[in-house]
Amino acid sequence: MEKIMPISPISGHMPLSQIQVPQHATTSPLLEQGNRLFEQSVRRGPLHFQSSSLKHLCAELRQLQNAPSSMQARRVQDAIQHWENHHPKEVMARSTRLAELKQALAEQGTVGRTLQSKVMATGPQVILKQPMPALPQSIAAQITKAQTGCTTTLVSSATAELIKHNQNNQQHIKDSDGRKPVNNMPPPPPPPMADKTQKVKKWVVNTDSKQLQALRYYSAQGYNLINTYLRGGEYVKHQAIETLLSRNYLHSNEPTPQEFDAGMRAYIQDVTEGLNELAITDHKKVYRGLKFDKSELKNLLDQYTTEGNIIAEKGFLSTSPDKAWVNDTILVINLESGHKGRILGDAAHFKGEAEMLFPPESKMLVEKVLNRDDKEFDSHFSNLRLTDDASADTTRIKRIINIKMLNE
């Protein structure tokens, strides 16, 4: 990575034309360590963490190194929490480096949030209206902030605007202060008035409904809590309370059991309604890879391998409209018009992942079970659409189950 030399603070009467616009902040060594850790994980394949979002985190980390951003830092933190919740053994083996990565995020991401709010409060337009004597100090202050290791796009943009403003208007400002023109040349005319018909850029405001925001949070990290709760599994109660408090579904950190259940139901209802807000699609088939070869999952395996059996999925059901992740069991789910599945698309937290999500209590009919030693297995296997991950071992697939999604 190209090393960026620090910019000297402005002092005395340094010509503003010599000031350089800060390009990138010096990268934290801890952040580089975290980047290398997850790059290694990518090379080992998505099955290392059982998460295709691993590649997205590496992209976020590279962007975060070049231009630290509070929003990107938050997405990286969400991804780390996702792995901590779902893959504790793998994470435990790398707890030291994850701790280092979190510290790096605290250094750059958290400081970024603090700095960004201050910069937006002043804003480049406010600074541009200051008289000439204050401009060098303003630029120096911005560059000093950049040298702390937290250059944001906003800071760079503001600094560039200040320099350009000074270069274009230096003569005009001097003339207005009663000083003589340089080299006996007349001062340039004042800058042209802005075209009032030109559209004014505004800050982007999140106009998503509360339900869509709940759905996006679910896709980031809330799915583990919700689905564990719906399926009657064990979850960490204080983490669940913190989640509900942060989403305004609880107003006390010591809720009664009734208050907690009411908060969870409201949260689940919002996610479901957010899902219903998405567009209906005409998909005819989706896929889902499952790992059933565990003794504790025998009862669940029996349900899925009994032809004619109707299964009611208590939690949200995540499927892929494109390809199935390789596992010991592949579900091929056939859909009819009017199904309740929705493609998350832009509503997903991690972009680029094709996912169709079905609401709780979706019912499925087991139509046909094909084991590897069945005669028809090979023909069905050749028609499967599987992930093209090089580390995927297709010999692990033991059964293909054809499912019909019931519109009830």
From Swiss-Prot:
InterPro entries recorded: ADP-ribosyltransferase
GO molecular function (one): toxin activity
Top-level enzyme category: transferase
PROSITE patterns found in the cross-reference section: TR_MART
One Pfam family per UniProt: ADPrib_exo_Tox
Keywords: Glycosyltransferase, NAD, NADP, Nucleotide-binding, Nucleotidyltransferase, Toxin, Transferase, Virulence
Effect noted on mutating R288A: 20000-fold reduction in mART activity. 4-fold decrease in NAD(+) affinity
Pro residues biased stretches: 184-193
Lineage: Bacteria, Pseudomonadati, Pseudomonadota, Gammaproteobacteria, Enterobacterales
Catalytic site positions: R288, S318, E355
Catalytic activity: L-arginyl-[protein] + NAD(+) = N(omega)-(ADP-D-ribosyl)-L-arginyl-[protein] + nicotinamide + H(+)
Name the UniProt record assigns to this protein: Photox toxin
